[in-house]
């Protein structure tokens, strides 16, 4: 879920923090990608006939197709991704995960009813609600991107939190995810719609956390408390408090403790055993690996390894795969050349400026006339 209605609240109160940019505008940038979110999106992006891509034996390959082509698109545009996968979910997320399981069970019943009625549109809708990324699919995705030479990290806990930690440490420019809680975890920049299909021609939606805090008139602690009131994966919401009310309460009372002391708890009943302090701690002190000494290395793709995996094992079209890998390698070379050209152009500018300064100094000396240490000729 991320944080309920946070995108709307930011749109209402901090429109300047949102920029729509072209994909190619991130040339030369390193980004941390919430891989688990990507896989989910690839799996729900079913074909027009409502089915997922599969091998002849019935194995789903939508996740591999999506990961392969989205990665190539990024590399082709000079973007260097790091894929971060979810680790063990925090204990406080158990309730949310149980709710998701219940929703999938209900969706399965509704899907079966729709099948009996021959309602194809409803069948497709409920099929998407049944999607869950399996451990095997995650491992296959890791294998693929590793063969492609892309760094892979297994987060101790939440992938978005680890992405945010990488961004805060300056290892990457931004977090790539559709989950808004990447901002709540402190990612300075969040990029949404970056992994959308190229055919959709959607701009990348860039969100700037510092601008959000400035426009909201809040510090990070207050922003986290706002996100908890809006609704997150760790605790229930307070019935009757929607996005507008939540924003007003934090603006006025600054923290959840003050809100609870002030509001009418008959009108706004507090959930039993509401562990908002623990939720706050999970956002402000998430379980992440230390990024300070972490070295991210992008390697040459293992072309034959990729062909073996995708074409031999997963029945992908070899000509298309090899053609795409050629495009990827050209993209890598272009990015490297651009960085070299950039280096020399900067050096040229510096040299030019130095020469210009020396010439100006010579001209100034001529204008001043003879130096003080010499006698002027009569």
Swiss-Prot record:
Domain of life: Eukaryota
Keywords: DNA damage, DNA repair, DNA replication, Endonuclease, Exonuclease, Hydrolase, Magnesium, Metal-binding, Mitochondrion, Nuclease, Nucleus, Phosphoprotein
Protein's cellular compartments: Nucleus, Nucleolus; Nucleus, Nucleoplasm; Mitochondrion
GO cellular component: mitochondrion; nucleolus; nucleoplasm
Region (N-domain): 1-104
Pfam families, per the entry: XPG_I, XPG_N
EC number of this enzyme: 3.1.-.-
Amino-acid positions noted as binding DNA in the UniProt annotation, renumbered to this chain: 47, 70, 158, 231, 233
Coiled coil start-end: none
Transmembrane intervals: none
UniProt-listed SUPFAM superfamilies: 5' to 3' exonuclease, C-terminal subdomain, PIN domain-like
Post-translational modification: Phosphorylated. Phosphorylation upon DNA damage induces relocalization to the nuclear plasma.
Cited InterPro entries: 5-3_exonuclease_C_sf (IPR036279), Flap_endonuc (IPR023426), HhH2 (IPR008918), PIN-like_dom_sf (IPR029060), XPG-I_dom (IPR006086), XPG/Rad2 (IPR006084), XPG_CS (IPR019974), XPG_DNA_repair_N (IPR006085)
Region of interest: Disordered: 90-113, 348-378
Cofactor note: Binds 2 magnesium ions per subunit. They probably participate in the reaction catalyzed by the enzyme. May bind an additional third magnesium ion after substrate binding.
Region (I-domain): 122-253
A molecular function (GO) term: RNA-DNA hybrid ribonuclease activity
UniProt protein name: Flap endonuclease 1
Organism lineage string: Eukaryota, Metazoa, Ecdysozoa, Nematoda, Chromadorea
Gene: FEN1
């Amino acid at each position: 879920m991320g944080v309920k209605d946070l995108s709307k609240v930011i749109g209402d109160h901090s429109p300047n923090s949102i920029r729509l940019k072209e994909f190619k505008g991130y040339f030369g940038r390193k980004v941390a990608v919430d891989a688990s979110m990507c896989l989910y999106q690839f799996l729900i992006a079913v074909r027009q006939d409502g089915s997922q891509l599969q091998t002849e034996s019935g194995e789903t390959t939508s996740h591999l197709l999506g990961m392969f082509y989205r990665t190539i698109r990024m590399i082709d545009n000079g973007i260097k991704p790091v894929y971060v996968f979810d680790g063990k979910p925090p204990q406080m997320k158990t309730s949310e995960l149980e709710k998701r399981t219940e929703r999938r069970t209900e969706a399965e019943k509704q899907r079966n009813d729709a099948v009996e009625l021959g309602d194809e549109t409803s069948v497709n809708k409920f099929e998407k609600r049944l999607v869950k990324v399996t451990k095997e699919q995650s491992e296959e995705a890791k294998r693929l991107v590793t063969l492609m030479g892309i760094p892979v990290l297994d987060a101790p806990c939440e992938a978005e939190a680890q992405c945010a930690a990488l961004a805060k440490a300056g290892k990457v420019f931004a977090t790539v995810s559709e989950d808004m809680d990447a901002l709540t975890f402190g990612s300075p920049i969040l990029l949404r719609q970056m992994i959308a299909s190229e055919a959709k021609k959607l701009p990348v939606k860039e969100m700037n956390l510092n601008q959000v805090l400035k426009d909201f008139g809040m510090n990070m602690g207050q922003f986290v408390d706002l996100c908890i009131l809006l609704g997150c994966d760790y605790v229930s919401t307070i019935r009757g408090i929607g996005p507008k009310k939540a924003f007003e309460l934090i603006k006025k009372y600054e923290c959840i403790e003050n809100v609870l002391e002030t509001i009418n708890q008959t009108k706004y009943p507090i959930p039993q055993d509401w562990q908002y302090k623990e939720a706050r701690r999970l956002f402000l002190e998430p379980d992440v690996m230390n990024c300070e000494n972490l070295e991210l290395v992008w390697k040459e793709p293992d072309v034959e390894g990729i062909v073996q995996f995708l074409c031999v094992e997963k029945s992908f079209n070899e000509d298309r795969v090899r053609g795409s890998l050629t495009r990827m390698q050209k993209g890598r070379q272009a990015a490297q050349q651009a960085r070299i050209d950039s280096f020399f152009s900067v050096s040229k500018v510096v040299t030019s400026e130095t020469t210009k300064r020396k010439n100006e100094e010579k001209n100034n000396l001529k204008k001043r006339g003879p130096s003080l240490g010499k006698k002027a000729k009569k």
